[in-house]
Regions:
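A conserved, well-ordered hydrophobic junction motif at loop->secondary-structure transitions
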Residues: 16-57, 61-62
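Residue-level recognition of well-ordered beta-strand positions that form the cores
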Residues: 23-25, 68, 82-84, 98, ...
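Non-catalytic linker/capping segments at the edges of enzyme domains
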Residues: 1-30, 125-128
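Surface-exposed loop/turn and secondary-structure junction residues enriched for glycine/proline
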Residues: 14-17, 34-35, 41, 64, ...
Length: 128
């Protein structure tokens, strides 16, 4: 649903409508000056863009996101995200994303991604 260049991090593997894997190295400019902890929006963006990339659609939107920041991340950490489509219902894809650093889960998210292509198709079918 999104272009490879729009993914936050480096895409390592992608199986449309199934799973995706990406990696991101946390640099000094990604952390808060006072605490040295990575800004949360980098992990959210990494997870969300990977979830969008997994969906095989021209256009898709994030309808719902449930996120949990589990462990603080510092500069120098290498994050690995894995997105898995857990199920699909009509135009909605339910995707679980886990981000790990050194095999420890630091972030997790559950997203509902809506395929706008399929939504439009369903609406046309209902009108007919």
């Amino acid at each position: 649903a999104i272009d490879k260049k729009d993914i936050v991090g480096e895409l390592l593997d992608l199986e449309l409508n199934k799973l995706g894997i990406s990696t991101l190295k946390i640099s000094n400019d990604m952390v808060l000056e006072k605490t040295g902890i990575a800004r949360g929006y980098y992990m959210f963006a990494m997870a969300n863009t990977l979830a969008l990339a997994v969906v095989d659609a021209e256009k898709a939107l994030t309808a719902v996101g449930n996120v949990k920041y589990k462990v603080p991340v510092s500069a120098g950490a290498t994050l690995v995200a894995k997105a898995v489509v857990t199920h699909k219902r009509m135009d909605k894809y339910y995707i679980f994303v886990s981000i790990k650093s050194n095999n420890e889960e630091v972030f997790r998210a559950k997203f509902i991604i809506v395929s706008m292509d399929q939504r439009a198709k369903h609406e046309r079918e209902q009108e007919a």
